[in-house]
Amino acid sequence: YGVWQTPTEYVNVKDCVVWSDYARAIVVGPEAGACIWGSGGLTDCIFEDCVVLEQPDGSTDYRAALSVVQQQQSIWGVTYDEYNGNINNILFKNILIDDIQSGGRPIWVEQCRPQKEWVGWQWVGVSFENITIRDTKGLRHKSYITSSTCGGMYVSLTNVTYNGEIITSTGKYLDFYNKSGMAT
């Protein structure tokens, strides 16, 4: 296993309309590094100048308009730590999340760890810049960031607005959950 694993690098998605009326919209990970998928990690991915329409469901796991997830994957029911991939330099820029549905969630970021420590996992630089969230149906599910601090986690939100209000910290529009007690 893992012989064919190569990283996915330098992906640029620009000027797209993503209509997510049934499924997840833009998800980075979570299969990065799982050899059943043949991937070795994700580096230098940019999603810019896009519109995400009608995000329908965000009540569980990482169903959101914009999502970055690093988690352990199994191969036919067996888990191999050495096949988990790094996530580095992921940028969402100038994105409009419009007309969120009654169960929708704008953003989900998750780094999760199983029972034992992962060795060598990296997560560096996940950024959200100039994200506009329009919700005419009322706040449903907050954006959510959760960490197990597997190999470091840096997430930045710059000029992220919800119905015109800038999100500057946790509260009405954003939750942060730290599973390990180590991240801040």
Residue ranges and their predicted role:
Residues 1-184:
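Extracellular/periplasmic carbohydrate-active domains that bind, remodel
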